[in-house]
Amino acid sequence: MRDGVRNYIVYKVDGNAHGHQTELWALLLDPTGMNTVGSPEMILKNDQEWEHGIVEGQWFVKVGNEFYLFYSGCGYANDCYSIGIAKSSSALGPYTKKAQNPILRTRSPMTAKSW
């Protein structure tokens, strides 16, 4: 992710694979993009019922001074796979989830399981 000046790496801690909380973390990179700066920050965790224990597939859009974090919940192989959004004034959070999440919801089992 890039905020216009700085680069970040954003990653998922796959807790759902082990029956634990799933988290998204962000870490600032140096100008070369090859080294980290500081400590990672947890920016999102699965805490809404529709997510079914999973947050993943994160991507960001910066509009003005706000960061919009789009993410998927419920797992790609399920017909409940959906997209949520959270907002922050800082790339490293904290992010606030939209109360009306998910903003897009899978309705057909064929959509999620077409592979």
PLM features per residue range, with description:
Residues 1-115:
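Carbohydrate-active catalytic/glycan-binding domains of CAZyme proteins
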